[in-house]
Structure formats: C-alpha cells, structure tokens
Amino acid sequence: MSTLNKYKTLIIISSLAAVSSCSWFSAKDGTEDIDDRYMKSQQDLELQVPPNVKQIEVQDRYRVPEGVIITNRNAKGKALSLDPPQLLLVGGDGVREDSEQSHPTVWVRHQDTPFMNYVSRFMMQKNIPVISSTEKQISSDWISDEDEDIFSQYIGSYNLDGQRHKVTLEIIGQNANEVAVQARNTQSQRLVDDKWVTMNTSKTVASQFLNAFLGFYDTERTKEARERILEEGTINVSLGTNSQGQIALIAERDLIAIWEHLPSVLEDLNLSVSDRDQSAGIYYFNVKEPETGFWAWLWGNDETNAKVDMEPGDYQIHLAATTYGVSMTFKDEEGNLLDSNLVTKIYPEFAASFKSRGK
C-alpha cells in the first residue's frame, strides 16, 4: 500500500471515530429537543365578523341560455367505458400524443422515407391480413386471439376469449417534419354460442395496436441510423463559420447524420442533453458543476466532470445545413453567441469525440 493510500485510510478511520464519539458524549433522553409550549396555549377571542359584512350567498351566475343544445357531454354512469386505460408509447424522441383527437393519435417526427412504407412493412412482418391499402391508410382483416401468430397477443389480451377485431392505421395530418398517425378499432365481434356477435369497438384495442406499430417503427429507425453511421465511417470536424459568418464547427456530413450522432458526442464529453428541437435544429445541453472538495480529492473521481473547459450552466448547439456540410453554432442559455475564443478552445475535444464516434 502506498503512503498516500495509508494517509487516506487513516483520515477516514479518524473521521468516523470522531463522529461516533461526539454522538456518544451528547446522547441524552431527547426531551431537551421537544417544544411543548403549545400545550400551555390559551384560546383567544372568537373571530368577530364586521357589522357591514353580509352572509355569502351562493348563486349560479353561469346559467345556460334557453334553446341551446348541449353536445359532446362527457360519459357518465353506465355510459362509461369498461375498458382498462391504455397509455400510448410517447416516451421516445420525436413522438407526441394528440389528445384532442377522438381516436388514439400521435405525431411522429419523420422527414425522409415515405411513412406508409413503415406501416406496410409492419403489417407484413407481423403477418397481419390486409383488406385495403392506400397512400394514407391501411386496414386489417379480422385479427383473432386464436390466431397462431404472436401478434394477436398485442391486442385484446384483457378481453374474454373468442374475440376478433379489425383495425385501421391512417395518416390524418402532415407537416414539414411530422406525420400524424391515428389508429381506429373499426369492428369488433365476440363468439357467443358458436356465432360471431357484434360488440362495441374499443379505444384500448386501437391504442394497443398503435403501440405495437410505434415499437416497430422505433426499432426500424434505430437500426437504420446505426447502419447509416457504420456506412459513413469517420466524421471529420473543422473550425469555420456558418452561413451568417459566425464562428462554428463544420462537419462534412448530412444534417440527419450529425443530428443522430450529437447525443453520443455530448455524452462522451460528460455534457448532459436537457432538451432537443429537431424542427429548429437545436440541442440543449448542460455543463454541471465540477465535483470539488475533500471527498472529491480523497476518491480522485473525475469521470463525471465535463471534459471541455466551459463554465457550468445551460448552452445550445444550433445545427444548420451549409454548402460544405453541417454547421454547429454554440450559444448560451439566452441564445447569445459564445465568444470565439471559447469555441476555439472547445473545438479539439468535440472534433476528437466526433472522430472516435464514427469509427
């Protein structure tokens, strides 16, 4: 054992012994810490209401005008659905629920490949029978819990035996960066006395079907991103300027590749991603306070400290396509450009991390 380790061990043992001895010398029955003054308190005068104050009168000031037809009332009593609640898989990056829709709907971030290609591949991979398909909609035939295919376990598992369902996936909205996907349980039947009897459709069945697709979509996108990174190889980063002439890091790669690569680079530099906005091309990250003091010196653990020389706080990285590739412009929490000297200082660490990530 080295001399330094012996000193560290001796300091730890001495500290523990000192704390134990202090607690033993000060030990009492604990009554000195009890404040029992409340037991001696006396009741004061009752609250006096001023003479000009009248009794509060509760009135319905928001009456519905006569002749108004009320629609879309929330279900009550027996009209409530007996289906168990089913949450949508919106925890992943780029997926958000559209709660204003009457059927389970999510907005999925998507820009390149036609989205319906993933829907068709999903139906094919899961061996789901298809009865109709268009550029924006695909509908299944009956999916039964008695099907041999494992996909039948994804829907109706909470229901009685002998049920079958038809489900439709449809693109109901689209913008530059997102696609709105909706799932509907169009038909449901139950087997009663060897006859199929129509039953109420279920939002839970639709949600489970949509969740199955979202899981497939996320897996496929992750696989494609990994293959793209392996094919593209090393990412070279240089110091340059963006399209506005501001100092920035320049990567000779397409925007999607850098966007997908940047989280692993920040993690490698011990910089935590706090948020992201792909539509605006912005990553938000945080530089934590370095661990200092006696215990940090004692254990000598610098693995969690930031590997770049930046002040603790919140920062932004703005990505934009340029003639030569992608520019990465660094800004502070308020959106102000970082000093060019600071960007020059942190450039080598970012360049080295990008290069190692691409191998």
UniProtKB/Swiss-Prot annotation:
Chief place of localization: membrane
Residue ranges of coiled coil: none
Residues lipid-modified (S-diacylglycerol cysteine): 22
GO biological process terms, semicolon-separated: Gram-negative-bacterium-type cell outer membrane assembly; protein insertion into membrane
Origin: domain of life: Bacteria
One Gene Ontology CC term in the entry: cell outer membrane
Record InterPro entries: BamC, BamC_C, NlpB/DapX
Annotated signal sequence range: 1-21
One protein family per Pfam: Lipoprotein_18
Lipidation (N-palmitoyl cysteine): 22
Topological category with respect to the lipid bilayer: Lipid-anchor
The keyword Lipoprotein is assigned to this record: yes
Record's subcellular location: Cell outer membrane
Record's keyword terms, sorted: Cell outer membrane, Lipoprotein, Membrane, Palmitate, Signal
The protein's role, per its UniProt record: Part of the outer membrane protein assembly complex, which is involved in assembly and insertion of beta-barrel proteins into the outer membrane.
The protein's assembly and partners: Part of the Bam complex.
Family membership noted in the UniProt record: Belongs to the BamC family.
Protein name: Outer membrane protein assembly factor BamC
Species per Swiss-Prot/TrEMBL record: Kangiella koreensis (strain DSM 16069 / JCM 12317 / KCTC 12182 / SW-125)
